[in-house]
């Protein structure tokens, strides 16, 4: 019969394994501890419920044993390496969405938001199009400050995950202006089989956190 110490060590090794197997490093990595803490601390309980509903539905996760379910990071123990990498980035995105929410007023005051078609943005937003706030976010020029760069990065991250979902992406209807006067070069950055589930999860991230 295994002891409590042995079970705790097994759980620790499982968590460490998932971290090691997260093969895709990104700008989000340094902020994952806080994102994980916020998530496990039920900072957004409704969001947590909906995200996991999508994870279990689309990623086909197996229920955890009662023993493992007592661990503070139990929600992440059964993720495959690919699933863990995906979910890790989504948690990072949740953390950055909070930053966007608390700092967008600063950018508005500094007149750093530039959209060629403000009328077009308002039309999309009033129609409930969830791409609009993302477009608004990435319209922030990536200035020299670390905070500005991170806010710009989350817009890039979310847009690259979401823009491929529509036959005629909203992004094509906008011209974004940056300091270098260039337009954005979008690419397919994820496995096509993951796009729909990521879209669903990100949609709930945006709705539940009510950014903007």
Model regions and ranges:
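General marker for long, soluble alpha-helical cores
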Residues: 1-212
């Amino acid at each position: 019969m295994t002891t409590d110490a042995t079970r705790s060590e097994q759980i620790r090794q499982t968590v460490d394994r998932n971290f090691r197997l997260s093969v895709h490093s990104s700008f989000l990595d340094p902020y994952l501890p806080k994102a994980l803490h916020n998530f496990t601390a039920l900072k957004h309980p409704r969001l947590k419920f909906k995200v996991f509903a999508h994870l279990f539905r689309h990623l086909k996760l197996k229920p955890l044993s009662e023993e493992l379910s007592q661990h503070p990071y139990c929600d992440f123990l059964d993720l495959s390496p690919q699933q863990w990498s995906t979910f890790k980035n989504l948690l990072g995105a949740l953390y950055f969405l909070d930053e966007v929410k608390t700092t967008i007023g600063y950018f508005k005051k500094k007149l750093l938001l530039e959209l060629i078609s403000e009328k077009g943005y308002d039309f999309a937003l009033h129609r409930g199009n969830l791409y609009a706030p993302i477009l608004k976010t990435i319209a922030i020029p990536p200035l020299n400050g670390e905070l500005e760069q991170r806010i710009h990065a989350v817009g890039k991250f979310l847009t690259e995950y979401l823009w491929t979902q529509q036959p005629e992406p909203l992004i094509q209807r906008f011209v974004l202006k940056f300091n270098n006067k260039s337009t954005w070069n979008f690419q397919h950055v994820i496995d096509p089989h993951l796009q729909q589930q990521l879209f669903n999860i990100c949609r709930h991230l945006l709705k539940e956190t009510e950014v903007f």
